[in-house]
């Protein structure tokens, strides 16, 4: 018996989207398949206190050894995929589907003179066209109820049909125009079969021409002032649009295709492949592979196709072995004999014709290698892409939460950077701006290889004009460590030093650690030699050594992922598959995310600033009232206190304060604000308050 906690996914790793989940036993066999509107909410139920679960559920979760899932777009797709995989794997705990029935389908008995629309289960019959399967029979009846008003085909049994013909009176559906009543001769066999053919075409996905035809008829009826008929056609159009929800995981019958998608970063890539056979998703496989070089998605596609279909082995990192910890197989490997006629990829490989020719030789027949651009195949590709991203996110979460991997990363960093101790506290700095405006910087902290978000800090750059990332980095590092020295001086560990902030920058005695109380074991800056030199200069100015015996410093350059140290002509090259480089990347990316978030926030705030912001007691509501009344700040400045006081909500005293504040911000004064944007109209306002 397994403990469910031993294979419970990490917190936050399960998506909140619709999907299908699979429990496997210790031998890898699928023992249960289920669907969920929210995978996170549903799977959380299985990992609750085991004593609160149903006895059968207890047995299932203790028999299982792992759980995996596949995300889809809608609940309908989840129902469809659940059905497919229950029939595929025959899981032992899915007992309610283990009878001799299958899911119901919508069947059209084309072999009859007057074809009938009906719910049908069991094996397929000759001369019957099927649509579905559906999860429930009531879903078929709802669909028919919507469509019969547009396609009034026969739905009654043979006995009812014959009896109506004998008495010369149709059933109720014939009286309410939901049946064309061929039983009493209202339409002949040819006319009724045309209705049935139109119904089949519509259910096959050819919806556009019927909708366009009904819309033309509706407009014509409205122009002819036949309003009742126009209203009925309008309702018919609505019924057609509600009747069929497109199912991306089900392609037209007979479609055999493999759908491949990737999610990647600089070091790794996740690949997902869905096997579509007979229009149904019959299986799914996924891997996370190492990238030994800077390859494009097209290169990844070529490597995957050759290894998956031509070598007969799984795609792999360096030696052709998959990362088994992140492999999710729901289908057998696809040898050359199973190469489908169509392979859908996100990008064509560089030499697509040659790859296609090799695949055709292996298959012995034509193979179409293509990128889906629209329609159901494009929608299915997007579903596979979401699964690849989800698998990649889960892989990164597992790796970041792996204590052994984190310990190895810290040890590797200590060795590579020749640090006296493992860098248990890492601080990373990044600068963000838009063409030199709203310049900000971020500081993120990782302790024991995990983010410590309560220690994150943001800096608004004050001493740098224009776009100068190097000077901004120097200011940021200088400000951070000057506060650290001030804290040491406050506690008596260090004598006072010139320029150290005191008093106002100190937190009250609350018992909590002060904002910059702890020194880092390693400082990482986002950038190459210029940024590293700027940070080292800031430390030197404060009398802090950068290197052994002081604060270790390095920079991580983008693209090539080189690690630069102060006063070194050559970078430190960490193996691309090392945990140390992966940790530095996570730290750098988190600093970049935090800086970008703050920069966007600050830029958004500055976009709605105006001279009226400096008026004491004037809130946003009254500022908008002023701008709505006068039209611009310039016209407010030109008005007198008495005129301003006429605006609703503005009293005489507030009007005088507005006049005084605008006078201080007039041209020629030191307090004149920079150009801003009128928050009401969106127009640009110059320093004189003139709207341009």
From Swiss-Prot:
Record Gene3D superfamilies: 5' to 3' exonuclease, C-terminal subdomain, GIY-YIG endonuclease, UVR domain, UvrC, RNAse H endonuclease domain
Where does it reside?
Answer: Cytoplasm
Any single biological process term in GO: SOS response
**Function per UniProt:** The UvrABC repair system catalyzes the recognition and processing of DNA lesions. UvrC both incises the 5' and 3' sides of the lesion. The N-terminal half is responsible for the 3' incision and the C-terminal half is responsible for the 5' incision.
Q: Which PANTHER family match?
A: UVRABC SYSTEM PROTEIN C (PTHR30562:SF1), UVRC/OXIDOREDUCTASE (PTHR30562)
Q: Which family does it belong to?
A: Belongs to the UvrC family.
Q: Which InterPro entries match?
A: GIY-YIG_endonuc, GIY-YIG_endonuc_sf, GIY-YIG_UvrC_Cho, Hlx-hairpin-Hlx_DNA-bd_motif, RuvA_2-like, UVR_dom, UVR_dom_sf, UvrABC_protein_C
Which Pfam family, any one of them, does this sequence belong to? UvrC_RNaseH_dom
| Listed name of the protein | UvrABC system protein C
Self-association or partners: how does it assemble?
Interacts with UvrB in an incision complex.
The source's superkingdom equals: Bacteria
Report keywords, A-Z. Answer: Cytoplasm, DNA damage, DNA excision, DNA repair, Excision nuclease, SOS response
All copies of the GIY-YIG domain together span 16-95
Entry GO CC: cytoplasm; excinuclease repair complex
Limits of the UVR domain: 208-243
Q: Which GO terms describe its molecular function?
A: DNA binding; excinuclease ABC activity
Asked whether the keyword Transcription is assigned, the reply is no
Chief location of this protein?
cytoplasm
Task: Please give the residue ranges the record annotates as the region Disordered.
Answer: 492-511
Q: Which residues cross the membrane?
A: none
Q: Which SUPFAM superfamilies match?
A: C-terminal UvrC-binding domain of UvrB (SSF46600), GIY-YIG endonuclease (SSF82771), RuvA domain 2-like (SSF47781)
Organism of this sequence = Parafrankia sp. (strain EAN1pec)
């Amino acid at each position: 018996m397994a403990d469910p906690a031993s294979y419970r996914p990490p917190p936050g790793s399960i998506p909140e989207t619709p999907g299908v989940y699979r429990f496997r036993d210790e031998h890898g066999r699928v023992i249960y398949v289920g669907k969920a509107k929210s995978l996170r909410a549903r799977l959380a139920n299985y990992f609750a206190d085991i004593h609160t679960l149903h006895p059968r559920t207890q047995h299932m979760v203790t028999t299982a050894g792992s759980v995996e899932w596949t995300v889809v777009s809608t609940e309908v797709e989840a129902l469809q995929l659940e059905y497919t995989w229950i029939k595929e794997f025959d899981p032992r705990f899915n007992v309610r589907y283990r009878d001799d029935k299958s899911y119901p389908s919508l069947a059209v008995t084309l072999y009859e003179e007057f074809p009938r629309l009906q719910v049908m289960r069991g094996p397929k019959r000759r001369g019957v066209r099927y649509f579905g399967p559906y999860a429930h029979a009531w879903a078929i009846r709802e669909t028919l109820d919507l469509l019969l008003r547009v396609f009034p085909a026969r739905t009654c049994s043979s006995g009812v049909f014959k009896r109506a013909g004998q008495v010369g009176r149709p059933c109720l559906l014939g009286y309410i125009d939901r049946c064309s009543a061929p039983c009493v001769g209202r339409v002949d066999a040819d006319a009724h079969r045309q209705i049935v053919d139109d119904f089949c075409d519509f259910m096959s996905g050819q919806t556009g021409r019927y909708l366009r035809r009904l819309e033309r008829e509706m407009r014509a009826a409205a122009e002819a002032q036949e309003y009742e008929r126009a209203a009925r056609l309008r309702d018919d159009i609505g019924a057609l649009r509600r009747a069929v929800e497109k199912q991306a995981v089900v392609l037209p019958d007979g479609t055999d295709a493999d759908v491949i998608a990737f999610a990647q970063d600089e070091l790794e890539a996740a690949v997902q492949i869905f096997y579509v056979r007979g229009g149904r998703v019959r299986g799914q496989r996924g891997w996370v592979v190492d990238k030994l070089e800077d390859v494009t998605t097209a290169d990844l596609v070529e490597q995957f196709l050759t290894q998956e279909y031509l070598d007969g082995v799984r795609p792999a990192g360096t030696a052709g072995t998959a990362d088994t910890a992140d492999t999710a197989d729901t289908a057998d490997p696809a040898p050359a004999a199973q190469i489908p006629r169509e392979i859908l990829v996100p990008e064509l490989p560089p030499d697509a014709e040659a790859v296609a020719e090799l695949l055709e030789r292996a298959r012995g027949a034509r193979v179409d290698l293509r990128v889906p651009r629209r329609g159901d195949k494009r929608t299915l590709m997007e579903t596979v892409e979401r699964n690849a991203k989800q698998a990649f996110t889960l892989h990164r979460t597992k790796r970041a939460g792996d204590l052994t991997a984190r310990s190895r990363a810290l040890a590797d960093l200590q060795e590579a950077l020749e640090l006296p101790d493992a860098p248990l506290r890492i601080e990373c700095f990044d600068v963000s701006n838009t063409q030199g405006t709203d310049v900000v910087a971020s500081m993120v902290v990782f302790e024991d290889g995990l983010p410590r978000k309560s220690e994150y800090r943001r800096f608004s750059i004050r001493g740098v004009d224009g776009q100068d990332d190097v000077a901004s980095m120097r200011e940021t590092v200088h400000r951070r460590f000057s506060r650290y020295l001030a804290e040491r001086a406050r506690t008596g560990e260090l004598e006072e030093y010139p320029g150290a902030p005191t008093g106002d920058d100190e937190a009250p005695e609350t018992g909590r650690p002060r904002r910059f109380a702890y020194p880092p074991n390693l400082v990482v800056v986002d950038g190459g030699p210029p940024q590293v030199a700027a940070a080292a200069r800031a430390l030197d100015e404060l009398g802090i050594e950068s290197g052994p015996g002081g604060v270790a410093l390095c920079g991580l350059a983008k693209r090539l992922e080189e690690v630069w140290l102060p006063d070194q002509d050559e970078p430190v090259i960490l193996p691309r598959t090392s945990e140390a480089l992966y940790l530095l990347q996570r730290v750098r990316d988190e600093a970049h995310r935090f800086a970008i978030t703050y920069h966007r926030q600050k830029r958004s705030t500055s976009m709605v600033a105006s001279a009226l912001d400096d008026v004491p007691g004037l809130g946003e509501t009254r500022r908008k009232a002023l701008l709505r009344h006068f039209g611009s700040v310039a016209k407010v400045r030109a008005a007198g206190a008495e005129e301003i006081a006429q605006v609703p909500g503005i009293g005489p005293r507030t009007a005088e304060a507005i006049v005084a504040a605008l006078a201080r911000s007039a041209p020629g004064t030191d307090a004149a604000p920079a150009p801003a944007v009128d928050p009401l109209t969106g127009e640009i306002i110059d320093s004189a308050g003139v709207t341009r």
